Structure formats: C-alpha cells, structure tokens
C-alpha cells in the first residue's frame, strides 16, 4: 500500500494508545534551517509530554512514511528540492520515488490510511485573496469534507481571505470549532474580528463531539482552532500591514500556485524581524499539546 509505519507508531495503534499525526511542510517549506528542525523535534516532544505518540509524515523513496526517526527528521530539514504534496500529486511522488513533504491535505490522507484520527499543524490553507478571479483555493478545504481526521490548528493562515475560507468550510459541511473562545483565530493573532461557528471549552468536549459526528456516519474531518498563547501573539491589526505588503509583492513578482504561501511567509518573517517565526513556532507547539490531550480523550 506504499505505506511504512514506524514501529513505535504501529505498536501504539495496535495497542489502542493515542497517536498524533504531524505534517512535514512546516519543516521543508514553512521555516528556515535550523529553526525548522528545532520545531519538528519540539512538536514531537510536546506530543510525547501529552501522553501520545508523534507520527511525523513525509514521502521518502517512493513510500509514505508515517513516523520519522530523528535522523530522518534531521535529513529532511536540510533536504533540497522537496516536493510540496497535496492530494493531486501524492501518487506522483510515490510513483517517481521523489522526496515529498505533506501538506495538511496529504497528511490527512496518510493519517487516515494508518488509522490516526488526530493531526496537529500550524495553520490550515484556505481561500486565497482574489480567489474570485484566480480560483486559488487550497485543497485542504476539500480534504476536510472527505477525510475523517480532526485537525488542530491556530486557524487559517492569516494571509488568506478568512471570511471566504469560513464560508467555504460551511458550504462543505465542515465543523469549525474554536477552543475556549468565541472568535475565529488568525494564526499569528488570537483574534480576527470573525465569530467562530462553534465553541467548545475542553478536550473532552471536543472528543465527544468527534465521536458523535463519526458515529452518525458524517464522514469528513473537523477544524479545531486553538488560539496562539497571548504572550506569543502578534495583534491582528499589526500583522495586517505586514501581510498586505507581502501579498502585494507576491502579486507584483508574479508568484503563483504552491509557491505563494512559502514566499509570503518567508517575507513576513523578514518584515517582522523574526517575530512571526517565533510566534509560528509557539503556536505549533501549543497545537501539538492540545492534539495530544484530544487524542488521549478519544481513546
């Protein structure tokens, strides 16, 4: 099945112990080296501290690897020409034996194949600005509607059109749950000015929600929005200036498709003097902690 499950992950799944999936584009496309490696290791540590087993996912040598060794993490963090994989090109990477990092969509697919129901990431993809003319909409949103894996995130990446992203998720019947807040978080910022569709206040409540959803045969995932810790956030009004500048540059330089998000994120790191990178690392760790709690309650 082109799937290789790490022995520790396999034992945990067979023993009905909690497992949390982790994506790999945050390593290869989301952060520079060596911060990417430090973050990858930290995310796995946070999951372990929460009583779950981490399963970082990537495509290596034509195989979907569910769970990476520390040596593999280190190698991936420094690898060049790594493909950024979604549903459409996951088979291509396997068939041609390429190296590929999994986006939210591809990680959900791999997690589902392995029997993992909880996945922690930084922020999800969504509807890009200007999508009414470009039709640039992340495949992540369709994956939420079809694959039964719950994703813990800090909301959608704030570089996106957040109102349209929420509308799209509603249209596709995807539950969007804000953890302990009435507001839809905006990645680097706790607030976006948008009301969250649903609110739940404990991991146990979220786990119960997921159990009910899936018991009703309502296939598809759920977006669990976990606001960045207050001490680590950059307020939305402040981030908006940096985002607008980076988005305008990307348009001016003709950057399109899968290159857009990595370019804008890297440019925002420069514009914020590294603050956005530190916030990104903090929110990812915060999401890993919540995902571990949630996975424990789902057992």
From Swiss-Prot:
List of residues binding substrate: 84, 104, 138-140
In this chain, Mn(2+) is annotated as bound at: 136
TM segment ranges: none
- What Gene Ontology biological process does one annotation of this record name? nucleobase catabolic process
Catalyzed reactions: D-ribose 5-phosphate + uracil = psi-UMP + H2O
Q: Which cofactor does it need?
A: Mn(2+)
The free-text cofactor remark is:
Binds 1 Mn(2+) ion per subunit.
Q: Superkingdom of the source?
A: Bacteria
Known EC number = 4.2.1.70
One GO term in the molecular function aspect is: hydrolase activity, acting on glycosyl bonds
- Name of one Pfam family that matches: Indigoidine_A
Q: Keyword set for this entry?
A: Glycosidase, Hydrolase, Lyase, Manganese, Metal-binding
Per the Swiss-Prot or TrEMBL record, the active site comprises: 23 (proton donor), 157 (nucleophile)
GO CC terms of this entry: cytoplasm
Q: What does this protein do?
A: Catalyzes the reversible cleavage of pseudouridine 5'-phosphate (PsiMP) to ribose 5-phosphate and uracil. Functions biologically in the cleavage direction, as part of a pseudouridine degradation pathway.
The record's family statement is: Belongs to the pseudouridine-5'-phosphate glycosidase family.
| Subunit description | Homotrimer.
**PANTHER family from the entry?**
CARBOHYDRATE KINASE PFKB DOMAIN-CONTAINING PROTEIN, ZGC:136858
Instruction: Supply the name of the protein.
Output: Pseudouridine-5'-phosphate glycosidase
- UniProt lineage: Bacteria, Pseudomonadati, Acidobacteriota, Terriglobia, Bryobacterales
In the UniProt record, the gene name given for this protein reads psuG
């Amino acid at each position: 099945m082109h799937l290789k499950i790490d022995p520790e992950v396999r034992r945990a799944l067979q023993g009905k112990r909690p497992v949390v999936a982790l994506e790999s584009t945050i390593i290869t496309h989301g952060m520079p080296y060596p911060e990417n490696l430090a973050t990858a290791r930290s995310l796995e540590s946070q999951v372990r501290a929460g009583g779950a087993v981490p399963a970082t996912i990537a495509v290596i040598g034509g195989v979907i690897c569910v769970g990476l060794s520390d040596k593999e993490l280190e190698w991936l963090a420094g690898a060049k020409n790594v493909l950024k994989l979604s549903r459409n090109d996951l088979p291509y990477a396997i068939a041609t034996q390429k190296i590929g990092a999994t986006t939210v969509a591809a990680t959900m697919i791999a997690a589902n194949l392995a029997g993992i129901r909880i996945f922690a990431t930084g922020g999800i993809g969504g509807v890009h600005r200007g999508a009414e003319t470009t039709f640039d909409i992340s495949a992540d949103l369709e994956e939420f509607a079809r694959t039964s894996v719950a994703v813990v995130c800090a909301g959608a990446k704030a570089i996106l059109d957040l109102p349209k992203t929420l509308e799209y998720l509603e249209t596709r019947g995807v539950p969007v749950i804000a953890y302990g807040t009435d507001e839809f978080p905006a990645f680097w910022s706790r607030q976006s000015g948008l009301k969250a569709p649903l609110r739940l206040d404990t991991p146990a409540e979220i786990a119960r929600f997921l159990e009910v959803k899936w018991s009703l045969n309502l296939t598809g995932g759920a977006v669990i929005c976990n606001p960045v810790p207050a001490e680590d956030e950059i307020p939305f009004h402040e981030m908006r200036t940096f985002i607008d500048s980076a988005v305008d540059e990307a348009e001016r330089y003709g950057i399109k498709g899968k290159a857009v998000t990595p370019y804008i994120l890297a440019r925002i790191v420069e514009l914020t003097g590294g603050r956005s990178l530190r916030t990104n690392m903090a929110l990812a760790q915060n999401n890993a902690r919540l995902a571990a709690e949630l996975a424990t309650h789902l057992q």
